[in-house]
């Protein structure tokens, strides 16, 4: 057992803090910007850790516009569209490396694509193509929602 009892809370808060600090930096301070790479790494702290650690507290509400997830972002989603299932699919996509960064204009990353598969099957059960800004909003809102439950 760890002597660090508030790991989950601190990890989520610190991950949110990392994003806030990065957003406040000027491009000149950063040299090359890797904000999307940083954000995808931060998804571990904003989505994966909360989903894994306090799974029973993940909302089972229907996924709706209040979460900034539009229907046209979702290409495949088998079963009921709940926040709990949506987050589980994103967690699986990240954990199993089924994630792609894509561009609409070939000069910058504009979207993140996630796929999730049922074990042993070749066809995805979930596919999402979401604009980076919408994913950031969702991840922050999800992390803050989960913090309120800890």
List each language-model region with its residue ranges:
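Long, hydrophobic, amphipathic alpha-helical segments used as structural scaffolds
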Residues: 51-58, 98, 102-105, 150
